[in-house]
Amino acid sequence: MNDAKKIPSFYETDLGEAPAALNWSSCGRWVAAINVNSSVMVVDTKTGNGLKRWIAHEDGALALVWHPRLPVFVTSSLKGEIKTWKVDVDQIVHKLSEITLNRDSGSNWIETLSWRPDGKQLAIATGSSAILCSVKGDIEAEFSFPGGTVAAIAWHPRGSLLGIAGYGGVYIYNALDSGDEPIVLKWKGSILSLSWSPDGAFIVAGCQDNTVHLWRFRSRQDAQMSGFAYKPLQLTWVDRGKRLLTGGTSELVIWPFDKKGPEGRAPQTRAFHEHAICAIAVTSNGKSFASGCRNGRIAIWKSSRDTEPKTWTTLDSRVEQLHWSPAKQSKLLAATSRQGLLQLFDASGIV
């Protein structure tokens, strides 16, 4: 442990059960969490007050994502329900729309949701397909994944392409024309997580076999990064996409993604956590970040070039989610634990 001081939280609440998802509104005012029993908690960080809690679904919840521009968020459940909610100016939350998808008997759960960058469509992974819906809940397109269950989806930064991944590789569809044939990036194993670089030059995947696989999008040239002790689900870009942070070990692994790319180059590592890293989040300016591990330790780093974190804290159990406020210049960090603790931290002046 270095000489960094522990950062205190300025807000704390019990979610009542393990968290299923955590996310900030685009304006940075509200942070919302939903637990596995579908109880929703919305905190107004401007006043420090929590809005009235409610049950979003009759069954278990799996995901929650805010719209990239509006005070609107979406929740999903095990039975294929998708509900859209809006926070009004009077701090009352009401339901905008509700749909239920039954695409695949026995696997209708929806745990992956992702808004198109411009907010015009929501991508929903269900069974062996990805469905695009409007903000109003109207289904506008559907893309199939031949490899079976969709494990991950990711939008190209410009928003015209949608990557769908699972067993056998990645299928990249043109969201503007559902009739176009997909671009297929084949891989022999199962993909669990997916991310585009901020410039769209690379698409990277965390794999079942404890590796990270990458493709250069233009040339389709691929490469593999190995040496992970666990599944590297965390794929987080810093320094305007010049570096990629990955989990999969107790050390933070930093891969170079400059013009030369990572092929044939050794990554840098940062030793701080004693247990496997299970959450990584980057600030809105893309420079500072936080990492969390299985024993509840959170480290806050000012730069990927620093060898030690600037501050740290410890939750009561495994770190489940970490998210920074997307508001410009904001340094508010939200964190949840396996036991259902939600805490907010202000790292202003630290990072």
Name each model feature, range by range.
Residues M1-V351:
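WD40-repeat beta-propeller superdomains and closely related acidic/aromatic-rich repeat-like regions
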